[in-house]
Amino acid sequence: MLSSVHVKAPAKLNLHLKVCEKRDDGFHDIESIFQKIPLYDELLIEMVDSSCTCQVISPDFTLPFENTLTSAYKAFCSCTGINGGVRITLKKRIPSGAGMGGGSSDGAAVLSGLSKLFGVELTPEQKHKAASSVGSDVFFFLEDGDRYDAAVVSGRGENVRYINSRKDLYFVLLCPGVHSSTGEAYALVDSWHNVNRAGNTPFNELEDMYGKPVSEWTFYNSFTEPLAWKFPEIRKALSDLQQSDADYVQMTGSGSVVFGLFASAEDARNAYDVLKDSWAECYYLTSR
């Protein structure tokens, strides 16, 4: 049996994110395109002698006592009946509170790592049950590999249909460094005058639109307008990327990272070389 495992947790971008009307239970359904990108958190999961223990060490980032890693550990133990103790060391590279799914991806990575560590393969039903108790975006990150880099996502995030991922997407990301909780962001969307607007791309056409030239995309993000209204830093990021001649500019998730998509790697690299001097957190990335 292994005594430790290393796992990587990729970030994601929402290329499109429509927030639907609030449901009777107070939650919202979404319609979205999720895209994994090669920016990773790294986790070292080690066995410890004590049972029913999940110790989390995060040297570069302060985590609350209860977090997605501990939630994933508890969910794994509940599904499998295993109660072995572990220590998880998290090396954080995905910006926090950025809309890039870092916490959810970390949770999925813990489930995967624990499966390897204890030699137990979770069934699809067990994975679904565990993900539902950790977070809505966890479902997208449950599978890894080229076949699982892009998906059409709906419901609260639990309905994931993987699609062929494009390899010709060239991103520049700007991190404004502001944060609004997910609850606050949804409240802003609910109060925003465009909350009920019809999407430019019907849900059943999202995959087809994804395959078109980026300059022809009619995607949008329901969070972008209200969050940009609240935070001038987000407005600045959107403006800077638009002025850099990106073919498509959008915010991911409920913010606050903003990304631009460029027609070529050269165009993206040139924009990055200019923007990195005025933005402390600026990234040049491609689709995985």
Q: Which role does the model predict for each range below?
A:
Residues 111-156:
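Contiguous, small/hydrophobic- and glycine-enriched helical/loop subdomains that border
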Residues 54, 143, 147-248, 263-288:
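Conserved, helical-rich catalytic subdomain that frames metal- and/or nucleotide-binding sites
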Residues 32-34, 128, 158-164:
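A generic local secondary-structure boundary/capping motif
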Residues 49-63, 110, 132, 211-220:
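Short, basic/glycine-rich phosphate-binding loops at helix/coil junctions
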